[in-house]
Amino acid sequence: NECIRKWLSCVDRKNDCCEGLECYKRRHSFEVCVPIPGFCLVKWKQCDGRERDCCAGLECWKRSGNKSSVCAPIT
């Protein structure tokens, strides 16, 4: 079962948000996965669709082929 990405609904799947996200009930709306304040993706963590979530000094690096992008040191 794939994790739920940022801003997508997590109704009935509160524990399935991707790493660094939590299920949050918005006022007058349904529950969505939102970033946990102060959280960032560490080196070599997958960052597909989360380019801005890498920790300081890292950037989301698109690997060749069909491999997923990862947070890598800024060169």
UniProtKB/Swiss-Prot annotation:
Gene Ontology terms: cellular component: extracellular region
Locations listed in the record: Secreted
Principal subcellular localisation of the protein: secreted
Region of interest: 2 X approximate repeats with cysteine pattern C-C-CC-C-C: 3-71
MF terms (GO), sorted A to Z: ion channel regulator activity; toxin activity
Cysteine pairings via disulfide bonds: 3-18, 10-23, 17-33, 40-55, 47-60, 54-71
Keyword annotations of the record: Disulfide bond, Ion channel impairing toxin, Pharmaceutical, Proton-gated sodium channel impairing toxin, Repeat, Secreted, Toxin
Domain repeat spans: 3-33, 40-71
Tissue specificity comment: Expressed by the venom gland.
Family stated for the protein in its record: Belongs to the psalmotoxin-1 family. Double-knot toxin subfamily.
Physiological role: This toxin potently and selectively inhibits ASIC1a (IC(50)=0.4 nM on rASIC1a and IC(50)=0.52 nM on hASIC1a), an isoform of the gene ASIC1. It incompletely inhibits ASIC1a activation in a pH-independent and slowly reversible manner (Tau(off)=14.2 minutes for rASIC1a and 31.8 minutes for hASIC1a). This toxin acts by binding to and stabilizing the closed state of the channel, thereby impeding the transition into a conducting state.
Domain notes for this protein: The presence of a 'disulfide through disulfide knot' structurally defines this protein as a knottin. This toxin contains 2 'disulfide through disulfide knots' that are separated by a short linker.
Protein's name in the database: Pi-hexatoxin-Hi1a
